Amino acid sequence: MAPKRPNGADALEKPAQATAPRAKRPAGLYAALDLGTNSCRMLIAEPRGSGFHVVDSFSKSVQLGLGLEKSGRLSRSSMARTVQALRICQQKLKKHKVRRMRLVATEACRRAINAKEFIARIHRETGLRLDIIEPEEEARLAVISCAPLVSPKTENLLVVDIGGGSTELVWIDIGGVPPTDRPHAIMRLHAGFKTGQRDRPQAQVVDWISVPLGVATRSEEHTSELQSLTNL
């Protein structure tokens, strides 16, 4: 009588299951929000090599500065529209778990007499903390955002940033900077247009100006003029 075979003797050996590779930890996301006189815009992006990959974005015309020229104040309807838009931004930031962000407000909030109260309301209703930045900082941010577009052959650069309520012009001299380092020299411009490093050739701000005129303010002026002519 043949000996009894042990259980499982005819079973094929199961191949070892390959361990699933661990998912790479996502790179930290960055967000930038610009609350202007006419629009509220936000980008959420992750670093990719020497640039960024946009993960999410938001843009809406909130007309925050509508009526500001006459009253000097942000209107109730304008503030309500803006808070509604910022709630959407807050939801996107929460969805993507963004921890590194810069949220700024510009000309309309610089000029409005009730801007501080509005910024406090934004924080109270959305949890977002917006900083009202000075014209010089707005101009600096416009300049460094153009750095990747600068050709190594460029020696002088004029940056014009036309917004809803203000326009900034900045003249930069990078002729003394080695051609391959010119975009980086612009990126090194710090607050007050000062460079943080003195051991290498620097970008020089020859002159700059910020004027309280933009697309929205000019449109409002022309609308008022047309209404005056209609009433004649």
How should these model regions be labeled?
Residues M1-L35, L43-I162, V170-S224, S228:
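Nucleotide/phosphate-binding catalytic cleft detector across ATP-hydrolyzing
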